[in-house]
């Protein structure tokens, strides 16, 4: 695969395989279904993957950074690229690709901010002590100051704080995947079922009045089928804060989705759509879509639709927001961006697997930077 191979040769680390596939198709074989007309975008990506030219530089952390080229067309206004802000629980775990806490799940930049003291249990209760509430407000404000285009949370129970979050910022706030419910309900007839998948079916019950208030949708409506994933083999790792073996869980989750759809097939109310409430379910969305042939809405589709409202259509857009983002996600570790005087308030510590991954990333960036600088120096001597 040309683009992926070029990525490996250059030493750059791009974790999102879907992005690599898209870029590969852009550079090699588009086919009769698509056509990429923006040669400038191709030139930028080509320079990113092949050599460090006058449009690129290294940042202080040794990461390869792409600079947008000079805009020679006065009709085009290069806007700041839209980015996402994510409020994180005081809880660290190794996120899978597709999880909200994995930056590689998105095709735009992401800023994270942990709220010290805001544990999963506290979030699930829907009540915040005054000190944690203020830290939550401060975190929303901080993300707003970074210029993010929208804000979400890394847990479905952040729905409890949807009203609080939107009172702090003028940016769009979708604290839970459940915020998509009104659009999903509007799209299907009243005699069709919508399946709501959650980490635990019982945990959604206390939220029903809140969902009705915030989304204008009654979850007690018989058109909703609540599906708990608590008995899916391997998915208990979510509740335990351990790394989820996605490959192991995948067939069981797909089978659960297939069985749920089959149970209602041929009835007066067939299932027409699936919505994943839990932020750790999106890694399975593609497989469930393929198996059921149904649309699957999750926290990633929620964020994408929110950010897409600020992005150009690549066919005829005029701002070319993609020229302003180099494709390298902002580096983040658990506890980053928390003010020094609040770090001691963190209840949890960074997960060992994430520490190891971070150290490996530092070593890779250091090695890549040294190799590129040596290559540049050798080229200069040859001249």
Swiss-Prot record:
<comment type="similarity">
    <text>Belongs to the aspartate/glutamate racemases family. ALMA1 subfamily.</text>
</comment>
<comment type="function">
    <text>Mediates cleavage of dimethylsulfoniopropionate (DMSP) into dimethyl sulfide (DMS) and acrylate. DMS is the principal form by which sulfur is transported from oceans to the atmosphere and is a key component of the ocean sulfur cycle.</text>
</comment>
<keyword id="KW-0456">Lyase</keyword>
<protein>
    <recommendedName>
        <fullName>Dimethylsulfoniopropionate lyase 6</fullName>
        <ecNumber>4.4.1.3</ecNumber>
    </recommendedName>
</protein>
<dbReference type="GO" id="GO:0047869">
    <property type="term" value="F:dimethylpropiothetin dethiomethylase activity"/>
</dbReference>
<comment type="subunit">
    <text>Homotetramer.</text>
</comment>
């Amino acid at each position: 695969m040309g683009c992926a191979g070029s990525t490996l040769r250059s030493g750059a680390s791009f974790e999102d395989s879907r992005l690599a596939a898209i870029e590969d198709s852009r550079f090699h074989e588009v086919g009769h279904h698509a056509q990429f007309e923006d040669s400038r975008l191709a030139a930028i990506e080509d320079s990113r993957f092949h050599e460090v030219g006058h449009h690129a530089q290294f940042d202080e952390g040794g990461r390869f950074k792409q600079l947008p080229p000079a805009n020679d067309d006065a009709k085009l206004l290069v806007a700041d690229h839209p980015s996402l802000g994510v409020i994180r629980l005081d809880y660290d775990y190794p996120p899978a690709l597709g999880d909200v806490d994995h930056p590689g799940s998105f095709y735009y930049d992401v800023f994270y901010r942990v709220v010290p003291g805001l544990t999963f249990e506290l979030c699930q209760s829907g009540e915040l002590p005054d000190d944690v509430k203020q830290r939550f407000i401060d975190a929303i404000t901080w993300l707003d100051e970074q210029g993010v285009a929208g804000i979400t949370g890394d847990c479905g129970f952040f729905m409890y704080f949807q009203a609080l979050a939107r009172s702090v910022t003028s940016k769009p706030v979708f604290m839970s995947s459940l915020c998509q419910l009104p659009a999903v309900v509007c799209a299907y007839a009243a005699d069709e079922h919508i399946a709501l998948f959650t980490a635990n079916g019982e945990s959604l019950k206390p939220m029903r009045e809140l969902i009705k208030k915030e989304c204008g949708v009654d979850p007690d409506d018989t058109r909703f089928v609540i599906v708990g994933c608590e008995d899916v083999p391997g998915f208990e790792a979510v509740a335990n804060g351990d790394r989820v073996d996605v490959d192991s869980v995948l067939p069981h989750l797909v089978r659960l989705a297939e069985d749920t759809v089959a149970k209602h097939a041929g009835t007066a109310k067939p299932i027409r759509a699936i919505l994943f409430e839990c932020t750790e379910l999106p890694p399975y969305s593609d497989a469930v879509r393929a198996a059921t042939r149904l649309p699957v809405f999750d926290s990633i589709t929620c964020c994408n639709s929110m950010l897409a409202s600020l992005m150009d259509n690549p066919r005829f857009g005029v701002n070319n927001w993609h020229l302003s983002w180099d494709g390298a996600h902002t580096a983040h570790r658990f506890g980053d961006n928390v003010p020094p005087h609040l770090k001691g308030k963190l209840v949890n510590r960074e997960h060992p697997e994430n520490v190891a991954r971070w150290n490996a990333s530092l070593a890779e960036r250091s090695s890549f930077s040294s190799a590129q600088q040596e290559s540049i120096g050798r080229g200069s001597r040859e001249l």
